[in-house]
């Protein structure tokens, strides 16, 4: 774990509005234990360093892979009621609705950690469900998943802009104005975005592609540190034109 005092600017003139501080949290992937720890760290940081307007931005991929997707969504819903927060959609949040309407989607979803999500809702899937089991599991999930969980995942934003910063799950397609970006790219893009060294319209804060430590570039920062496998959930604290600190579990 680390609590780095970054206080550095790698992106030129990009800055947040005066008085705004953003806590951006990377991919959680079913690790409710780490999310709970991180939210406590953020609360402690806020108490030590009061800000006129603190916003927590969650970068998506709350479910799958880790053991406690249901508990993660409960924590996020509780946070939504008490704090100023922005919840972005990750590619993994698209699987639930797709599976409920077309159970064979589980062929793809299980390869992305979907079975762990089903287990968190009390279902008991086999390792490689056939079509009849997929249909049964979809019916069981429809009965067991709280409506507020479905409504939460359906309400997630694709991006959030604040000052000169853009917060998004995966990234953006280079050369395409932000207003014209496609949902598929915002949720899934990798190489074309990651390899681009040119300045973007805004400095991009993202997750989606796991890295060992936060990857800070001149045009973006990646804070997906593979929490479900590494035990390291990362939060970038941004204020003015600098990363004030990097919090980690």
Where are these regions (language model features)?
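N-terminal active-site segment of His-dependent metallophosphoesterases
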Residues: 1-73
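Active-site HxH/HxHxD metal-binding segment of metal-dependent hydrolases
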Residues: 83-116
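A short acidic-Thr-Gly-centered motif at the start of a beta-strand
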Residues: 11-18, 48-49, 76-80, 158-161, ...
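Catalytic-core regions built around general acid/base machinery
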Residues: 72-82, 148-155
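Metal-dependent catalytic neighborhoods of phosphoester/phosphodiester hydrolases
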Residues: 62-78, 98-105, 215-216
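Acidic, His/Gly-enriched loop-helix segments that form or flank divalent-metal centers
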Residues: 101, 112-119, 123-222, 226-232, ...
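Active-site neighborhood of phospho(di)ester-bond hydrolases with catalytic His/Asp-centered motifs
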Residues: 25-26, 57-60, 86-90, 203-209, ...
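Short, glycine/acidic-enriched loop or turn micro-motifs at the edges of active sites
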Residues: 29-30, 64, 94, 172, ...
């Amino acid at each position: 774990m680390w609590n780095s005092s970054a206080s550095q600017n790698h992106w030129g003139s990009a800055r947040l509005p005066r008085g705004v501080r953003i806590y951006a949290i990377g991919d959680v992937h079913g690790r409710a234990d780490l999310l709970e720890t991180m939210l406590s760290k953020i609360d402690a940081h806020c108490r030590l360093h009061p800000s006129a307007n603190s916003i927590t931005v969650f970068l998506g991929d709350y479910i799958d892979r880790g053991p406690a997707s249901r508990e993660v969504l409960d924590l996020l819903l509780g946070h939504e009621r008490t704090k100023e927060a922005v919840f972005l959609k990750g590619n993994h949040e698209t699987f639930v609705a797709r599976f409920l309407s077309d159970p064979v989607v589980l062929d793809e979803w299980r390869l992305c950690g979907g079975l762990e999500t089903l287990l968190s809702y009390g279902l008991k899937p086999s390792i490689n469900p056939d079509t009849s089991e997929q249909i049964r599991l979809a019916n069981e999930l429809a009965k067991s998943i709280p409506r507020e969980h479905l409504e939460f995942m359906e309400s997630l934003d694709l991006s959030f802009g604040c000052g000169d910063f853009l917060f998004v799950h995966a990234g953006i397609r280079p050369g395409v104005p932000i207003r014209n970006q496609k949902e598929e790219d915002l949720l899934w893009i990798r190489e074309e975005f990651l390899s681009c060294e040119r300045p973007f319209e805004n400095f991009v804060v993202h997750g989606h592609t796991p890295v060992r430590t936060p990857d800070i570039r001149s045009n973006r920062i990646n804070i997906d540190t593979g929490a479900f496998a590494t035990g390291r959930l990362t939060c970038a604290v941004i204020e003015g034109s600098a990363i004030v600190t990097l919090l980690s579990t």
